[in-house]
Amino acid sequence: MLSVNTIKNTLLAAVLVSVPATAQVSGNGHPNLIVTEQDVANIAASWESYDAYAEQLNADKTNLDAFMAEGVVVPMPKDAGGGYTHEQHKRNYKAIRNAGFLYQVTGDEKYLTFAKDLLLAYAKMYPSLGEHPNRKEQSPGRLFWQSLNEAVWLVYSIQGYDAIIDGLAAEEKQEIESGVFLPMAKFLSVESPETFNKIHNHGTWAVAAVGMTGYVLGNDELVEISLMGLDKTGKAGFMKQLDKLFSPDGYYTEGPYYQRYALMPFIWFAKAIETNEPERKIFEYRNNILLKAVYTTIDLSYAGYFFPINDALKDKGIDTVELVHALAIVYSITGDNTLLDIAQEQGRISLTGDGLKVAKAVGEGLTQPYNYRSILLGDGADGDQGALSIHRLGEGHNHMALVAKNTSQGMGHGHFDKLNWLLYDNGNEIVTDYGAARYLNVEAKYGGHYLAENNTWAKQTIAHNTLVVNEQSHFYGDVTTADLHHPEVLSFYSGEDYQLSSAKEANAYDGVEFVRSMLLVNVPSLEHPIVVDVLNVSADKASTFDLPLYFNGQIIDFSFKVKDNKNVMKMLGKRNGYQHLWLRNTAPVGDASERATWILDDRFYSYAFVTSTPSKKQNVLIAELGANDPNYNLRQQQVLIRRVEKAKQASFVSVLEPHGKYDGSLETTSGAYSNVKSVKHVSENGKDVVVVDLKDGSNVVVALSYNANSEQVHKVNAGEEAIEWKGFSSVVVRRK
């Protein structure tokens, strides 16, 4: 059994695995994919002994029995995602898989008959299908609007067929295989070469579908092209996807939402490979990359939900079916009892042999707390294309988590938000990211597609908590250019007193460079950690700099006086996302630090900030999302934007402090006022010092040299004193 340390240690030398040039499908009996003959025997003998497993199985059985009562319904394809025919075919493929499983475990032939009848109906219909009548613009399908859904149908349905194949007559097998499985495998592979060979989650689903079909049908050719690409050279296919789509830390370049989605084909196909060709040692490939990917997917969450960076729907979390199945497989391999903590939080069990092991271990009380770590997740196949930094302090669901997005673009699903950040605290998202503009499978909202506002708003830089120059998005909104560049990670540090991530972006705009350092600081006299943010920007030409902060909560007050637009609200701008923001208030600010305070649930948050710049034209803008949205596609959001005009240089410095407690039931409030008295910033010879003065007379001194030499001594004159430190950064708390 692989040790947990082996899996998590990203510095371990890669395990060299030789992959045979030609696949040799084993002669295993059926089922032989995700569930094996031995699994069936184990489940049948003991599933009622484990409450979690029995509850899940009985629930699935009840649901399937109700579905079966409706009869075999296989409509001709008509609707796009979210429409009736689309959803019915989705229900059908899940029913085929579940019926096959229940037939194996219970021996009740009604499940075999139902799965068989569904598959025979598809075998009769599929050969007559052309392109879907509501086909998607790219990679259209036949049964579904896009070929991606076709691949998902095959991944599920072939598992159901695997479970019933030994109970079918020869002519029934021939009809099903020649009518639907082989034609669909052909359509997804040789007839869709661009998608099949693509290093992308759509390609992963396609190769998994075709490869799993090959294992069940005993077709070496289907397995080999799935593993090595259509030309069998290894330049495409599953093995190349394992090489390219995950970083050495297990981070998927499109971000957590699509990492979650891609887990299913990766893990299920790998399980099928392990079952049929264990000599490949697929779960050890590339230094256990698939196991790391599952751990990383968990780490990319807070309070049960994934970080909504890039194209992401914010209601997706660790209870998603993809992670339920993946966790069971990884637990079976590692025996890591901290994964049981996640399994219990998921609230459901994978109905597989691996899921039985999870249920058994939970029932035996083996659960240990999962360790949500502060980690740096390198991006790109070699881990050298930027990184995602996750800093955590505290325990449980209410701990604080700071996310610094210093990653590569993330291909077509990426957003133009270099050096963006998010903050979580007290179980909530405090500094927020919009995610994607989409109502998945809600046909009334543009057929469930990504909305136009995904491009006009959600992907634009102004929709994020990062620097905007001259109201233009990063890379001027061009994804091809954006894919060529990534931030430079300058430093990552995780200590007891403070944590730090720092990165530089020099390509987002012509003639502009900006560096951002985010710190999570423990201050003994404060109840909660504080966030310190230092963003320096320099430009060749005088420019307008905007730095948004999207915050979640009800505004309490500002230290600055705002000018309200009483009679009319106007758009903040005309394009690049600005056209979707209503300008509510404006306020001129100067060189002294200012503050905004809001409340969320029972906790207050104060954002103290100061901007160092030669420009005398500084303003704070308060805006709301919703302009130019006639179809009400956009959620409400509020934003504080710090604007500097006609400047070549600016340093945006801020401190975010959680404080106090409000109890509406008891009608009590404590600590409603910020503990931060002022924020001061000094820059000298490319070094920064930030002094956070607290009301109790103490202060926090943050020093940044941007020099990685840990022995190099640095000095900055801050007022009447000289601040000295060694290395890239220093944080000192000085008591009164």
Swiss-Prot record:
Could be used as the key enzyme to produce alginate monomers in the process of utilizing alginate for biofuels and chemicals production. Zn(2+) binds at residues 415, 433, 464. Disulfide bonds: none annotated. This is Exo-oligoalginate lyase. The keyword Zinc applies. One of its GO terms (biological process) is polysaccharide catabolic process. The lineage of its organism: Bacteria, Pseudomonadati, Pseudomonadota, Gammaproteobacteria, Cellvibrionales. Pfam families: Alg17C_C (PF22686), Alginate_lyase (PF05426), Hepar_II_III_C (PF07940).
